[in-house]
Regions:
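Membrane-cytosol interface motif
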Residues: 43-48, 145-162, 231-239
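Hydrophobic membrane-embedded segments
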Residues: 1-130, 134, 275, 312-314
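Internal/C-terminal transmembrane anchor helices
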Residues: 42-50, 287-312
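Active-site scaffold of zinc-dependent metalloenzymes
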Residues: 158-181
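Hydrophobic alpha-helical transmembrane segments in integral membrane proteins
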Residues: 132-143, 304-315
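Function-determining sites in protein domains
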Residues: 313-424
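Active-site recognition of the HExxH zinc-binding catalytic motif
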Residues: 185-198, 205, 233-234
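Short helix/loop segments within enzyme catalytic domains
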Residues: 195-196, 220-277
């Protein structure tokens, strides 16, 4: 359960960076069509559901695996690696102080707490889904006695605001007290929801919220998704209306608004959220120019490229050390396997050989770390620009410590090539 929770935690953290970007874009793109905001939330959903991601130099995600399962379970001092120095420096000292491994223990204390957190997450997921099911069944019971007036359109005395109920075969339910003008405007709105497939997207958003209920940023994202769905639907309805019809539509919005405590799961209720903002948006609506629409599409593409991809991992010696072989002015190796460590300065040819062996290594990045057990050797490099890097080696792991530049030390699991490096 701990492994599942840590996987979801890392996906959640990666998506949180995207949510922050969407929040900024929502603030600065007031003139953009509202469907752009919904599309941006769709990109957030993709980030949450995709278990994999391609690597790209254009990625703006600081780290694809902020919390490494291997580091949490086995590292002497568990740490996170967000690649944001302010966050790492604030969190890691506390983790090291309270969750450092006990020499006689098989796993870190943090791993035990992570296992507990996994079961708490599962209970929370069950509670969220149970809430959705109970809300759906209660609403079904309320509308069980309804009068059909058209195909899949019903009048109901037990409701005060219209909504759509159902995912596969959606039905529109209208309060029986609506006059003809209100009914026409309400039906236009609800049918626009159906045309946009909003009766799919909102329940999907709630399911994702249920899975990631532990992340408050995603609660904010879901709330704004519900609001943006309504705004986008309003724009679809009023884009062909004249000024008088828009005013009538806005009046109906106010008349059909419902309390904020209304059900937030399956129903897509007319007037459900942000009524004041929706009325203001309707009254001031202007059809966006072509260049605004084109710019909105371009923004969505750029956001997808930058936030659906992961940052590239270190793939060669230059990536590990932080500078290329031709930039190295000094290199040495320390044999730490014996009681008395011995140090030898490497010649140019030996430095070439070490870089070639580092190039041949295959490894997986585990995360940030400050120490490593069973180190048998230490490599030390200095560049012409004064950059310094230390690499500590063990049988199955490698700790890369960029001494200069303010970067965090990184722990790697060695997959292949470590035997050749050790023998050399």
């Amino acid at each position: 359960m701990a492994a599942v929770f840590l996987k979801l935690l890392n996906l959640s953290i990666s998506a949180s960076w995207l949510v922050l970007a969407v929040l900024v874009l929502r603030l600065i793109s007031k003139r953009s069509p509202k469907w752009m905001n919904v599309l941006l939330w769709g990109i957030v959903a993709l980030r949450l559901v995709l278990p994999f991601s391609i690597e790209s130099a254009l990625s703006l995600i600081p780290s694809a695996e902020t919390v490494s399962p291997a580091v949490v379970q086995f590292a002497p001092a568990p740490t996170i690696t967000s690649d944001v120095s302010v966050i790492d420096n604030a969190v890691n000292p506390s983790l090291s102080e309270h969750f450092s491994a006990v020499p006689t223990a098989s796993v870190n204390p943090l791993y035990v707490w992570t296992e507990i957190a996994g079961w708490v997450w599962l209970i929370g997921l069950g509670a969220m889904l149970l809430y959705a099911l109970v809300s759906y069944l209660r609403l079904r019971r309320r509308v069980s006695v309804s009068l059909p007036i058209r195909d899949r359109i019903y009048l109901c005395d037990a409701i005060s605001s219209p909504f759509i109920l159902g995912v596969v075969k959606p039905h529109i339910y209208l309060p029986s007290g609506l006059d003809e003008v209100q009914r026409q405007n309400v039906l236009a709105h609800e049918q626009a929801h159906l045309a946009r497939r909003d009766h799919w997207w909102k329940p999907l958003g709630f399911v994702l919220l249920a899975v990631y209920w532990f992340n408050p940023v995603l609660w904010l994202a879901y709330t704004l998704l519900c609001r943006d769905i309504e705004l986008a639907c309003d724009e679809r309805v009023i884009r062909t209306m004249d000024e008088s019809a828009v005013k009538t539509y806005s009046t109906v919005l106010l008349a059909c608004s419902m309390p904020r405590k209304a059900v937030i799961t399956c129903p897509l209720a007319f007037g459900e959220v942000g009524v004041k903002e929706r009325v203001r948006n309707a009254l001031h609506y202007k059809k966006p120019a072509f260049w605004v629409v084109a710019a909105s599409v371009a923004v969505c593409v750029v956001v997808a490229v930058c936030f659906l991809t992961n940052p590239p991992t270190d793939t060669d010696a230059a990536g590990l050390v932080g500078f290329r072989r031709e930039q190295v002015t000094y290199a040495d190796v320390t044999d730490a396997s014996g009681a008395q460590p011995s140090n030898v300065q490497l010649t140019a040819e030996e430095t070439d050989a070490v870089y070639a062996l580092l190039d041949a290594l295959q490894y997986k990045r585990l995360g940030a770390a400050s120490a490593m057990e069973d180190c048998y050797a230490r490599l030390y490099f200095i560049s012409a620009a004064g950059e310094r890097c230390e690499i500590m080696l063990s049988e199955h792991e490698m700790l890369v410590n960029p001494i200069t530049g303010g970067k965090t030390a990184r722990l790697y699991e060695l997959r292949s090539g470590s035997t050749e490096l050790r023998d050399y």
